[in-house]
Amino acid sequence: MIPHRLFRFSGGSLPYDCVLTLRAAGPMKGRTDEENRARVFSGLGIESSRVVSLTQIHSRTVYVAQTPEDFSDWKEGDGILAGNPDIVPCVTVADCMPIWLCHERAPCFGVLHSGWKGTGIIREALAAARRVWGAEPAGFHVILGPHIRSCCYTVDDDRARYFSENFSPDAVCLDEARNQAGSVWPWRLSLAEANRHLCRDAGIPDEHITDTGECTACGSEFGSNRREGSGSFTHMAALIRHVVH
């Protein structure tokens, strides 16, 4: 049994499984951990040849996948959309947020890697979906997956200001105790709130937005840069596949 979490979009009837491998499944970084990736995908009942991945660069670059072969050169980017049900889009995360999305009418589904630098990638994904499939934001369902949350994510004044001005003032909160102690990271940052604001602003209904509510830095079952250390953290695979329920 491969240690993983399974998430479903709101309503539960959309034909997609959203999967996050856990720390115990082992490292899942593309190119580096190919043997383990093949083992894990096989254990999940997925042919490795169907999986589409990227060289992730903490960007807002989103690709539309037509065939797995289109990505054999490991394009640089952080989001994958597909309309072909044979394709399994996959990114890796460890404190950054996986965002799964699908449309309730258009044949469009995908997964995004959204850390602080890539916050806003959901906008690019929605724009691409509208351009390729004519998919309007109101028909999208979104899952904001496990990531480092404000309980563990403290930032400096510059990053707090950046999120407040570019996304939402509600994405940051001053920790008075840390501030009074003279910490250079006195602000608590909520990637979930920033992305929720982006989804709402784009026109995705609140009832279509699911937040798993889990913190990767708190939960030892997750890979976490903050908890495990930058040189030894576990990349988890976040993937989405078309299924027949």
Short names for language-model regions:
Residues 1-245:
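Active-site microenvironment for binding and transforming phosphate-containing groups
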